Amino acid sequence: MRRKTLFLILITVALLAAGLFLARDAIRTALFDVTGEENLLAQVRGLIDYATNLIRPLPNTADDAVIDEAGGSPFGINTFLEQEVELAKRDRQLQLIAGAGYKWIRQQFPWYDIEIAGKGDFQDCRHANGGPCIDAWAKYDNIVDLAEQHGLEIIARLEAPPKWAQTASGDFAPPANLDDFGDYVAAVAARYKGRLTHYQVWNEPNNYPEWGEQPVNPEGFTRLLCAAYRRIKEVDPNAQVLAPALTPTISLDPGPGPGTGLNDFIFLQRMYEAGAGQCFDIMSAQAYGLFSGPTDRRLRPRSVNFARPLYIRDLMVQNGDARKPIWISEMNWNAVPDEVADKRFGQVSLETQARFLPLAYERVQQEWPWIGVASTWFFKRATDAEKDQAMYYFRLVDPDFTPLPVYDAMKAYTAK
């Protein structure tokens, strides 16, 4: 009897093992769909983490809310067109972007490159060498013209003060006089009224060095945001103003200094308490997966994964902003090669990057009805001077216009 029982147990274990072996691919796919992890051990750990979702309050995302400004197509991409000296290369960039199915570009209109040498000075004499200066607007007029020709809309990033406007140190320090910043954003909005419709004020002000060599300051930033909002709306009441995306961080050290910053949830709540809710039409967020894929459903406020925008949405709902959408400013995975030491943005293969980015857009469209445009980070850099830096490897296309697998994957996905 004992032998028979032992035999039955062994048969049962063997059948279970065989079943698990035969179903291993389906099991691993199911675990990836929950954890965003591809390694089996990481999937098991991730499943345990996911179980903690059941014992903590889930974000209230108000998925049934009517959203005011969806943006049409969700496909946006970050560009650095101002870095391209040759006009033909700007045109080729936008041709390839439109050809891949993107409908929006997120493009800087940096203050230091427009009102360069002093208040009211829109001439660029930096490379004149004794000859005539050029119109500082010409570059940006060309970018707007080309975007229109290729059927692309622009999210214009308004940021980066010139030295003459700053008293605090640091390239990204805010202006000493908010009226100067207001004049700049009003000048951009007036020049492109009816052609540019969406303006984003600043970028990641909760993180060093995006507020200069001084502690980050949610209340100070809110004053700048509200000043810009008023001036843009005075010029173009129909324009839409985007709040900046905040750096996803758990840091509680406002800085200044490398590695410092203020947690994005705390910074945003303090912005709301300072009155920021009246000073933007669209919220922004970063959606980096970093060390796991786009299907990661673990809700972990003390770590960064693709699900983090759910917490930004929850804060918006708590503060009465359920009708406003979130537009994702930056989204991608880092295909940094082994020889680059910096892996702070995670590391995936070129093939995995090409698989993850379309999956991210799929999740955005299927699960997050309050997301409008989601902008891929990024199309290309003008040169390979930064190829020793991890950030360079988010690109879709090399500086010589060689497309990477992720470009082809997005082109195929948007065509579906």
Predicted regions and their residues:
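Aromatic-rich peripheral "rim/lid" segments of glycoside hydrolase catalytic domains that contact
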Residues: K4, L8, T12, L16-F21, ...
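N-terminal carbohydrate-binding accessory modules
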Residues: R24-W104, K119-D121, H127-G130, D145-Q149, ...
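Hydrophobic faces of well-ordered beta-strands that scaffold small-molecule active sites
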Residues: S73-T79, I105-Q107, I154-L158, Y199-V201, ...
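Acidic/histidine-rich helix-loop elements
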Residues: I77-L87, G170-P175, G259-G261
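Short, acidic/polar
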Residues: E84-A98, D180-A190, G261-E273, A354-R363
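Substrate-binding cleft and catalytic face of glycoside hydrolase catalytic domains
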Residues: A100-D124, A128-P258, L290, W333-V336, ...
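A structural motif corresponding to the C-terminal end of an alpha-helix
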Residues: N142-I154, R191-L196, A227-A239, A274-C279, ...
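Noncatalytic carbohydrate-binding groove/subsite architecture in carbohydrate-active enzymes
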Residues: L178, G182, V216-Q347, R395-L396
